[in-house]
Amino acid sequence: MEEFRMYRDHTKVIQIGNKKIGGGNPILIQSMTNTKTENVQATVEQILALEAAGCDIIRCAVPTMEAAKALKEIKKQIHIPLVADIHFDYRLAIAAMENGADKIRINPGNIGSTERIKAVVDVAKERNIPIRVGVNSGSLEKELVEKYHGVTAEGLVESALDKVHIIEELGYDNLVISIKSSDVMMCARAHELIAEQTSYPLHVGITEAGTLYSGNIKSAIGLGIILHQGIGDTIRVSLTGAPLEEVKSARRILKTLGLRKGGVEVVSCPTCGRTQIDLIGLANKVETMVQDIPLDIKVAVMGCVVNGPGEAKEADIGIAGGVGVGLLIKGGEIVKKVPEDQLLDTLREELMNWDSNKTQK
């Protein structure tokens, strides 16, 4: 893949459990459970499924002391770093760290007095647990809204840095910053601004992005703009839907930007009057079929035997459909003709026997 990205290569390295972020380490995918954290079994089952899908870091809501204590048992049964999401009650942050949280997410502005923030920081310092300082456009301080005549990227950055300075003044800098907005361009601008002013790792995402359809579009555009500039160390695709879909989308975004390998990429033509088969159905079946195949290749699914071979040239392997008969294509060359009803099975067999060392690019 031709390289056009800029790199923010001075990012501070932060250890989160068994993972490192920043300093040129790979961008990690994060999601958040939607189970009741107090329900250990349900939460563990969901996390294990997310792990299998490619989730690198998982965050759990900790609204109660029971949830904080549940982290200890959850932690024993999972294999990725566990982040505790804390609001308002500093005691929950302390309990979460005491029960195995690898990182905590707080907003110092709603934790309370300096003494309470210090109590949290002291435990984090003692255990060397990173703190993610999060700000959100929906809760920007009134004085900053007034100062900037509304919710702006500049206001979000000032809010984030103010909160970071509170913790720095307490002698701690094991920090990650997140700035979230549902406004894509505001979010992108805020990340550009803060990347110029600090070397802390940044967790990136478009908050309240929406449903699977609209949320994926907003997240892909927003994350694409930000990541293309070399900004971002962890990402989350926030969707109103199953966390598993967040991870799938995040993997696809990183792969599309050339930031992560692995996983089959399916390309297919948009259909036209020359389409001779049920291409939509076939393409969907192929995409479902390849979800769990760990090959780093491109598969083309084309709708006619006239233009299909040419359009599939950039793919490693492809199929093109025709009336009653289709084509199997490798490296842009027609390998053989295949009965139409055997196209999917033929492709599956080829992928199962694929030799990655002979991948044609």
Residue ranges of predicted features:
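Active-site mouth loops of central-metabolism enzymes
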Residues: 24-42, 61, 80-88, 144-157, ...
